[in-house]
Amino acid sequence: MDFENLFSKPPNPALGKTATDSDERIDDEIDTEVEETQEEKIKLECEQIPKKFRHSAISPKSSLHRKSRSKDYDVYSDNDICSQESEDNFAKELQQYIQAREMANAAQPEESTKKEGVKDTPQAAKQKNKNLKAGHKNGKQKKMKRKWPGPGNKGSNALLRNSGSQEEDGKPKEKQQHLSQAFINQHTVERKGKQICKYFLERKCIKGDQCKFDHDAEIEKKKEMCKFYVQGYCTRGENCLYLHNEYPCKFYHTGTKCYQGEYCKFSHAPLTPETQELLAKVLDTEKKSCK
């Protein structure tokens, strides 16, 4: 029976294949379900992450996938060729940059030297003009010196030399020896056979001991009353050229009463010929003013 059944109902030759196919389909369905569940989990995690960090975050699955791909392609990659080409290009660009930089640095000092030369030209011209002027002045001075050679010089230098030689010899100074007579008459006054400095007599001589004229004289006051003394603020005091308390009091000497008494600013002393003349002048001026 069994043998007949085999010929009448032969076994299905594809039965083994279908069984294996069904098993594989079941395994694929399980894998897809697992992958879908993993993808859903990843989506949920991404939704929970803020927007700022979503793009930066990388799933571990994708990173593993990338690593595997990089390992697979490392053997067949062309990185070595690309890197060599990029290095060659970089070296060429670097050489070009260095050459351009050197050219620019070489051009800058030339321009600066040109500018400095342009700036220095007016200064150099000014300096030349100054040197020419100085040389011209020196030439004039030399000519002036040549005009008056010898010991017979007429001028301030000669006077100083002669006075210095006299002082060394111990002789008395002769200040007026080398001065013209017109100059002496203009600036002096004769007193007792001496030429006295008229500015000294007026108390206006500034030179003092260095004055060329004599100061050996008594200063006589002018026979006039000091108007500042009458007003009460003459600052010169005893050095004033005008009369102060020497002037005669017209009230006392005319017989009228002087109300100032001892405190009078003018003199109550007996009249002298000089003071009598002064009193007469005062009385004459008053009579003329009354008329």
From Swiss-Prot:
There is a cross-link at K43 (Glycyl lysine isopeptide (Lys-Gly) (interchain with G-Cter in SUMO2)). Pfam families: zf-CCCH, zf-CCCH_9, zf_CCCH_4. It is found in: Nucleus. Residues 127-148 have a biased composition (Basic residues). GO terms for biological process: apoptotic process; negative regulation of DNA-templated transcription; negative regulation of T cell differentiation in thymus; positive regulation of thymocyte apoptotic process; positive regulation of transcription by RNA polymerase III; response to antibiotic; snRNA transcription by RNA polymerase II; snRNA transcription by RNA polymerase III. Residues 154-165 have a biased composition (Polar residues). The modification Phosphothreonine is found at T32. Residues 168-177 have a biased composition (Basic and acidic residues). Residues 1-26, 51-75, 93-179 are annotated as: Disordered. InterPro entries: Su(sable)-like (IPR045124), Znf-CCCH_ZC3H4/6/8 (IPR054361), Znf_CCCH (IPR000571), Znf_CCCH_sf (IPR036855). A zinc finger (C3H1-type) spans 191-218, 220-247, 248-271. It comes from the Eukaryota. Component of the little elongation complex (LEC), at least composed of ELL (ELL, ELL2 or ELL3), ZC3H8, ICE1 and ICE2. Interacts with ICE1 (via C-terminus domain). The N-terminal region and all three C3H1-type zinc fingers are necessary to induce transcriptional repression. This is Zinc finger CCCH domain-containing protein 8. The gene is ZC3H8.
